Regions:
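C-terminal helix-coil-helix/basic helical segment that borders enzyme active sites and/or dimer interfaces
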Residues: 20, 24, 31, 47-81, ...
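Gly/Ser/Thr-rich beta-alpha loop segments that engage phosphate groups in nucleotides
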Residues: 32, 36, 42, 99-103, ...
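C-terminal structural segment of proteins
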Residues: 12-13, 82
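A glycine-biased, small/acidic residue-tolerant capping/turn segment at secondary-structure junctions
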Residues: 62, 86-112
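Glycine-rich phosphate/cofactor-binding loops in nucleotide/flavin-utilizing enzymes
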Residues: 100-142
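Single conserved hydrophobic/aromatic residue that forms the stacking wall/gate
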Residues: 1-7, 11
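DHp/HisKA dimerization-phosphoacceptor four-helix bundle of two-component histidine kinases
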Residues: 38-41, 45-48, 52, 77-84, ...
Length: 142
């Protein structure tokens, strides 16, 4: 789970970078679209989700390397946050690009489809949420 969580970090970052670059280059009403509050908030949300997912992945890696009792919940948390962050980043990347987001001239659609594929790679989001709940219940019982 952590390998795919870490691998998706690269794709999340590429989605964010693509959206930021497009927001700087694309002009509407004489200003870059990145200067508008709605776009700024989308980019900020993408960055926050990416950073939280990376932090959770680091925590899961630490739990694995130290044989921590938190490993089941840490790895499930890393996977859930990675899936959600990648889906958010790929969706908001498309939204930032507007109508161009689903054209073949831009790679936004590729990141969106890859986010769907990676989310099913080792189990669905609901599956990993259930694993997280189970591991948290077990840790509270002990």
């Amino acid at each position: 789970p952590m390998n795919s969580s870490a691998a998706s970090d690269v794709y999340k970052r590429q989605s964010l970078d693509m959206a930021v670059n497009y927001a700087k280059e694309r002009y509407a009403f004489g200003r870059p679209i990145g200067s508008y509050q709605a776009i700024k908030h989308k980019l900020a949300d993408m960055y926050i989700a990416l950073t939280l997912a990376k932090s959770n992945c680091y925590y899961a890696a630490w739990a694995l390397s130290t044989d921590s009792a938190d490993l089941p919940s840490a790895s499930a948390t890393a996977r859930v946050s990675a899936i959600k962050a990648y889906q958010l980043c790929s969706q908001e990347n498309i939204q930032t690009h507007g109508g161009n987001g689903f054209t073949w001239e831009y790679d936004c659609h590729m990141f969106y489809r890859r986010s769907k594929l990676l989310s099913l790679n080792l189990g669905s989001l609901s599956n990993w949420r259930e694993k997280l709940v189970t591991s948290l219940e077990q840790s509270n019982i002990n």
